[in-house]
């Protein structure tokens, strides 16, 4: 009998609000899940708290500062390349501009327009939670 243990990668995502809109970021076409939209964020490094990881990732990806508020939800999603445990947080933008260092596009969406883009599968439970809370 063999047992396969799946490594679960802990990641965080920022649901960033500014002027009543939410930031959606489009993955680069040549990346995994290329062209899909997501909440910006990334892997939690060893000995790093989720909130510290989120601040670091937003600074790296968008050259922006955020204030982190409450957790929205946690989702475990099995992609063909990895299983991730995504925790998303409601955040507010603390800077006026963003720079797309790791994404090809970004949009500020009203919650009523949140389904106007094609989201990465792991982000769908967060979308549902946002819609239920709205």
Where on the chain are the PLM-derived regions?
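Conserved N-terminal beta-strand and adjoining loop/helix that marks the start
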Residues: 2-22, 43
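Conserved hydrophobic "DFG−1" position in protein kinase catalytic cores
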Residues: 16-17, 24, 91, 108
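Short secondary-structure junctions
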Residues: 61-68
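Active-site-adjacent beta-strand/loop module that shapes the phosphate/pyrophosphate-binding cleft
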Residues: 65, 75-97, 107
């Amino acid at each position: 009998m063999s047992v396969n243990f799946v490594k679960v990668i802990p990641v965080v995502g920022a649901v960033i609000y500014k002027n009543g809109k939410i930031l959606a970021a489009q993955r680069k076409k040549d990346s995994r899940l290329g062209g899909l939209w997501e909440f910006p964020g990334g892997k939690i490094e060893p000995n790093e708290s989720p909130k510290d990881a989120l601040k670091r990732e937003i600074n790296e990806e968008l050259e922006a500062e955020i204030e982190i508020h409450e957790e929205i939800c946690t989702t475990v999603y099995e992609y063909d390349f990895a299983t991730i445990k995504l925790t998303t947080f409601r955040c507010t933008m603390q800077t006026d501009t963003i720079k797309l260092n790791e994404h090809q596009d970004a949009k500020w969406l009203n919650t009523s327009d949140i389904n106007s883009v094609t989201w990465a599968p792991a982000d769908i439970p967060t979308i549902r939670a946002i819609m239920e809370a709205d």
